[in-house]
C-alpha cells in the first residue's frame, strides 16, 4: 500500500496500533532481545521497527534501494496471507542447479522436487496445531507402509511434519483408513487434522509457484504446478485415481477400471458405455451417465506457432 517506506513511517504506523498502547502501559509484558532498562517508549518502538525491517530485508521480502519497498517475494507473502516464519521456509527450497549435480535420472529428479516441495509445505507455521498426540504413532506407521504412499518416510516417524506429510500423501494416494479398532480411536482427530491441512495448503503452494516463477526456475515451477493440481484434485497428478473426480466413481470402481486397463480420464472417456457397465457390474445407463459427466471436464490444449527465424 506504500504506507511504510522508511523507519520513521514504520514508527508512525506502529504508534497507531494497540501494541503501542500496551507497550506504554505494561512494558514489562513485552521483553525484547537486547532491551535496556530505562528506555523510552519511542526508543522501544524504534527497536521493534528496525529489528523487523532487518528481518524482512535478510529474507529478501523487503528492498531498500531508495525507500523501503516490498519485493516480489514480499508481495506473494501478502497476497496469500503467509506468515513470516512460513515464508522463510518456503524460500528455502533448493534451486535445480544444486539438485542436477547429484541427480541425473529424470523420474528421480521429479520425485526429488515433489518430495522437497511437500516437505517444505508441511513445515508451515499454519500447521502448528497438527502434531502427534498420545497413541497416534502406530496409526501413522501403518499408513506410511501402505501401497498408495508416493514418498514413504524411511526413518523413524517422530516429527509433526512427518505426520502432516503422511496425511497429505494418504489422501492423494487414496490410502484407506485402517479398519482396526485401535486406529478407529484416532479417526476423528485424523479427519480434523486433514481438514486443517487442506484448508491452508492451496494458498501456500500458490505462493511457492509465484516465488519460483519470479526466480525463473522452470523445473521447480512445473513441479509446484503439478503438486498444486494434485492437491486441488486430492489425487496425485497422472495417477489412475484421477478418475475418482468423476461422481459415482470411488476407489473400488477405480481399481476395477485399472484392472481392465482403463488408467486415466482420457482412457475412460474413450471407453464405450456398455464396456463401462460390464467392468463395473452396473446396469444399463450407468456408462452413458459417466460419459456425459466426462464431457463437462475441461480439456486444455497449448499450441505453438513460429513467428519467424530464431537466430
Segments from the language model and where they lie:
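Short coil/turn segments at secondary-structure boundaries
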Residues: 25-29, 81, 258-259, 269-271
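Short linear loop/turn motifs
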Residues: 28-34, 68-70, 271-272
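Helix-hairpin-helix
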Residues: 73, 236-290
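C-terminal helical accessory/scaffold domains
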Residues: 1-2, 11, 37, 41-45, ...
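A structural signal for beta-rich interaction modules in eukaryotic proteins
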Residues: 285-311
Amino acid at each position: 500500500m506504500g504506507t511504510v517506506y522508511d523507519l520513521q513511517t514504520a514508527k508512525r504506523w506502529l504508534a497507531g496500533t494497540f501494541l503501542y498502547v500496551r507497550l506504554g502501559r505494561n512494558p514489562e509484558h513485552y521483553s525484547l532481545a537486547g532491551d535496556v532498562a530505562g528506555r523510552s517508549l519511542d526508543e522501544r518502538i524504534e527497536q521493534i521497527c528496525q529489528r523487523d525491517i532487518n528481518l524482512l530485508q535478510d529474507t529478501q521480502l523487503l528492498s531498500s534501494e531508495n525507500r523501503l519497498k516490498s519485493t516480489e517475494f514480499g508481495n506473494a507473502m501478502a497476497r496469500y496471507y503467509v506468515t513470516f516464519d512460513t515464508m522463510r521456509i518456503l524460500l528455502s527450497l533448493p534451486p535445480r542447479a544444486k539438485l542436477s549435480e547429484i541427480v541425473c535420472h529424470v523420474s528421480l529428479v521429479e520425485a526429488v522436487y515433489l518430495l522437497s516441495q511437500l516437505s517444505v509445505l508441511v513445515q508451515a507455521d499454519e500447521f502448528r496445531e497438527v502434531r502427534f498426540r498420545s497413541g497416534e504413532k502406530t496409526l501413522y506407521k501403518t499408513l506410511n507402509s501402505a501401497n498408495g504412499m508416493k514418498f514413504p518416510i524411511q526413518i523413524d516417524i517422530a516429527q509433526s511434519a512427518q505426520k502432516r506429510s503422511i496425511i497429505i500423501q494418504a489422501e492423494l494416494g487414496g490410502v484407506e483408513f485402517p479398519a482396526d479398532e485401535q486406529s478407529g480411536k484416532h479417526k476423528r482427530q485424523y479427519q480434523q487434522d486433514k481438514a486443517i491441512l487442506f484448508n491452508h495448503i492451496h494458498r501456500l503452494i500458490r505462493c511457492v509457484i509465484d516465488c519460483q516463477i519470479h526466480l525463473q526456475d522452470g523445473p521447480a515451477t512445473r513441479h509446484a504446478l503439478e503438486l498444486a493440481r494434485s492437491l486441488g484434485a486430492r489425487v496425485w497428478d497422472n495417477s489412475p485415481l484421477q478418475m475418482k473426480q468423476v461422481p459415482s466413481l470411488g476407489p473400488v470402481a477405480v481399481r476395477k477400471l485399472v484392472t481392465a486397463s482403463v488408467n486415466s480420464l482420457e482412457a475412460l472417456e474413450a471407453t464405450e458405455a456398455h464396456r463401462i457397465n460390464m467392468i463395473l457390474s452396473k446396469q444399463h445407463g450407468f456408462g452413458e451417465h459417466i460419459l456425459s459427466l466426462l464431457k463437462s471436464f475441461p480439456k486444455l490444449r497449448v499450441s505453438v506457432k513460429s513467428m519467424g527465424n530464431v537466430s
